[in-house]
Every structure is written in C-alpha cells, then in structure tokens.
C-alpha cells in the first residue's frame, strides 16, 4: 500500500486561526483528526505545522504487468542455450542506444536539419494516427500486426 505524508508550515494553510481546509471536506474521502490507520486521509495540526498523510486504498494494475514482463524475461533466460550470446546481445543493444542518442544530440545541434527532422516527425505522426489509430478496423489491424511481430520475435 502506498502512502504520502507531508508537513506544511502553518502560514501556508492557516490565517489568524481560520482554516482554509474547508474545501478538502467536500472531497469523497474522510477527514479525521489524529492518525487512524483505517482512514485514507489523516490530518493532524499542532501550533507550528499541519501534517497530512494520505494512504492508497487499493492496488494498482501496473504491478501485475511488471510481473508478467519479469516472468517473460526469466522464461527466455531459462530456455536459452547460449547465455553468453544473450549477454552480448544485451550489451550491443546498450551500446547501440548510447550511440544513437549521441548521434541524435549531434544532429539536434545543427540549425536547419533539426527543424527538418521535426517537420518529418510531425508529418509521420499525423499519417500514422490517420492510418492506424483513427478508426476501429485500422486499430484492430495494427493490433494484429503488433501481435504477429511480437510472436515472430519471441519465436512462438
């Protein structure tokens, strides 16, 4: 469960013993004095500061997709016969990423070429959105293409 806590100085939220926290009470969570582990929001006030602690009430679905990615990588690593080749491929990928970032940085410093590449990028993004993302049958076609490419890469 995630939680966030903050301590704010008194002058930011209180003016002459009048609280500016009345708008918080209109929100759909409970506002209590003191710390209560069961409530999603706890507010405590002492003369010098206001402490606010917020806790998440549920789990996010992002953790399940992270576990799927980790399990997929573990399966590929376990099934591999040439682990040295996988390590070399990973290292080559990192070097290629580093080199391409340096190349892009060098091109970006040139005055006219970077503007031309931005125009090409905008035009390509517009075409891709119109071709694959605007209408439902085109989105389904893109989904099939991506699934086929992933299956080809993973050897399934």
Swiss-Prot record:
Record bears the keyword Transit peptide: yes
Stromal-side segments: 56-83, 131-156
Similarity comment: family membership: Belongs to the CURT family.
Effect of deleting the gene: No effect on growth behavior, leaf coloration, grana stacks or photochemical efficiency of photosystem II. Curt1a, curt1b, curt1c and curt1d quadruple mutant shows disorganized thylakoids with extended stretches of unstacked membranes and broader stacks made up of fewer layers.
Keyword Mitochondrion: no
Keywords: Chloroplast, Membrane, Plastid, Thylakoid, Transit peptide, Transmembrane, Transmembrane helix
InterPro entries: CAAD_dom, CURT1
Organism: Arabidopsis thaliana
Subunit composition and interactions: Homo- and heterodimers and trimers. Interacts with PSAD2.
Cell location: Plastid, Chloroplast thylakoid membrane
Transit peptide as recorded in UniProt: 1-55
Lumenal topological domain residue ranges: 105-109
Transmembrane segments: 84-104, 110-130
Record function comment: Determines thylakoid architecture by inducing membrane curvature.
The protein's name in its UniProt record: Protein CURVATURE THYLAKOID 1C, chloroplastic
Pfam families registered for this protein in UniProt: CAAD (PF14159)
Chief place of localization: plastid
Membrane topology classification: Multi-pass membrane protein
GO cellular component entries: chloroplast; chloroplast thylakoid membrane; nucleus
